[in-house]
């Protein structure tokens, strides 16, 4: 078994088993704090009896003890919900993305968290129900929901072909009977980028939604932003792909959870849950456009501290992904978080 040092089993005619990897566990009074160097996988656990321990499970590095409590800082990633894709229209814009470090938060105080929902999609007859994504919040930091994709509009009403403004803007849709095609919506500075305009041709492409990393390019959704707060580099907030009026290849969603668009009568794909990706738009006919992906809030704090979350929030904790840190991924709900010494 891994991290037990157990010997592997022998064999007869078959293959023998390997031995388990080793482990190092160091126990010390809780008046001391661990400094853990890079290159090792470790977690620190408070025993609540006057002692804590650090358990090392892989790698090579350094370890020392100090009586100085490290400064309390919170690294954060706040991604809003992506916009819904347009019917006969453009891809939804990605949810706004904000990331950084906050050193001004206080221990034993409560801070609000809200995870934004993705915007809704619809078929062409129900196009008025297509919506932009909802905002995500951590403390005073708010990311704006992605703009909905532009939806077929005509001279006699119903729908708007211009992509909506959002964290990233939605892609433009079809102006039936009016000539031309809809413009992409603008993104919010510092959070995302603009959606693309629809193109005018014999087989119109509808615009892709903007992404957190780049604006949309024609029918394809903009790429999301790469972030490594969890210890693994991951794309978030990709724009949704735009629809295609007739048969052929519709727009693809941007890296970071953007949904693909569809051609005539097809169903597009939704933005990926907890990425803030925009939903894909549809082509002509009565195909159904897709919802945007929900947002996420990820918090990373030194492992000398801990976080407590209220009811109403769905949260996953990880104390081993990054040395010396506790990482909390909040994936749904509304509530509060309180920080304290571990």
Model-derived segments and spans:
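Low-complexity, glycine/proline-biased repetitive segments and flexible coils/loops
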Residues: 1-342
